[in-house]
């Protein structure tokens, strides 16, 4: 079949995709050899889902005569649902697969499965005494700031609600193996994508320069989950007690967007700005629904940036759509696309979103931080 050359729109869209792939690889490979490399992978999980799924959809939906074509990958036949759910966790209450009720249910189930898993070895009349002090929740911090929890990581790994319902202790033991297989398949797909983009004249940095993160340290404390949620419930006083896990997850996304991903991706990364805007949009809506009394009011100018459905769609998808004509002629296509939608420059967008993220992080961290959680640490846990 005869193919046609890239259109001008495809050319700029592929340039942006190649940059995002390079940035994702930088975030995935950069921590190699870092003492906290295992913990730094948690904040990048939604980005893996976003870049892989959106690039696959972009190529798969190209016209039949286009130079673009879907890649022959096993990622989506083996882990398609996991990719979708990994990417969807950034949506929090806005996830179309269950909404607020679905997120609450999977977080509660992740908690109960963790309790069962960690208590499993301690059966019998004597060892059962240990169970009272057995941790079932790990929380990761950068400084005082909570960036991830193991209860939220389970669904963020792409494990669905139905899968988690059927999980046994043996399945939990195999999570590391599953995670490795998933990450390996993501790596294979990104290599295929980089090769294809190179054939179209788009360069992907397969061995990007490692970020300087020597001073970025992640600490870890173990807890009995019920004690943490009791303290968080008292501190946040959400509209409904069942929302407390979602509030903690939103805080983790916000802090990852502020304290981890800028170091891994670079502060001028389009992929970073996508994540920060998506976090402000979805975490903002989730927190407005759960703890509105804590959030600061936002002005109409801020709302234009933080609650724009058009901006959300531009960040969540790889096609430029109505913003393409403006983006094609610009030195910064992504910034130009944003400005064409809301008449706000990229620098102003970055200032607004960072101010909101910092303000909300400060307000929530004043109520839930490494120091405030210290009295809840499990006696039998691991702490750093």
Predicted regions mapped to residue ranges:
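Amphipathic alpha-helical interface segments
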Residues: 1-304, 340-384
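Histidine-centered, metal-coordinating catalytic motifs and their short helical/loop contexts
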Residues: 301-339
């Amino acid at each position: 079949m005869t193919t046609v050359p890239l259109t001008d729109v495809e050319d700029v869209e592929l340039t942006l995709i190649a940059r995002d792939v390079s940035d994702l690889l930088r975030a995935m490979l950069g921590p190699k050899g870092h003492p906290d490399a295992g913990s730094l992978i948690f904040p990048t999980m939604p980005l893996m889902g976003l870049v892989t799924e959106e690039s696959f959809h972009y190529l798969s939906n190209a016209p039949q005569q286009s130079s673009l074509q879907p890649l022959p990958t096993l990622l989506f036949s083996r882990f398609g649902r996991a990719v979708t759910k990994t990417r969807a966790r950034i949506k929090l209450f806005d996830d179309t697969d269950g909404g607020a009720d679905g997120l609450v249910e999977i977080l509660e189930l992740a908690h109960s499965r963790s309790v069962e898993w960690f208590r499993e070895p301690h059966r019998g009349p004597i060892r059962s005494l240990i169970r009272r002090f057995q941790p079932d929740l790990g929380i990761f911090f950068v400084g005082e700031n909570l960036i991830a929890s193991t209860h939220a990581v389970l669904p963020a790994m792409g494990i669905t609600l139905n899968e988690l319902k059927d999980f046994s202790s043996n399945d939990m033991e195999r999570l590391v193996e599953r995670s490795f297989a998933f990450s390996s398949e993501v790596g294979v797909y990104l290599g295929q994508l980089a090769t294809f983009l190179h054939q179209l004249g788009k360069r992907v940095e397969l061995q990007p320069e490692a970020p300087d993160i020597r001073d970025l340290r992640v600490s870890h404390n173990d807890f009995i989950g019920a004690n943490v949620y009791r303290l968080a419930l008292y501190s946040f006083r959400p509209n409904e007690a069942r929302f407390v896990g979602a509030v903690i997850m939103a805080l983790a996304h916000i802090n990852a967007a502020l304290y981890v991903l800028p170091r891994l991706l670079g502060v001028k990364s389009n992929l970073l700005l996508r994540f920060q805007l998506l976090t402000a949009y979805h975490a903002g809506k989730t927190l407005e629904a759960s703890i509105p009394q804590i959030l600061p009011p936002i002005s109409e100018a801020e709302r234009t940036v933080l609650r724009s459905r058009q901006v959300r769609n531009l960040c969540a998808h790889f096609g430029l759509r109505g913003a393409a004509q403006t983006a094609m002629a610009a030195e910064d296509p992504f910034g130009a696309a944003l400005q064409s939608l809301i008449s706000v420059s990229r620098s102003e967008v970055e200032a607004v979103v960072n101010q909101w993220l910092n303000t909300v992080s400060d307000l929530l961290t004043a109520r839930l931080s490494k120091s405030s959680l210290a009295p809840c640490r499990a006696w039998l846990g691991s702490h750093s």
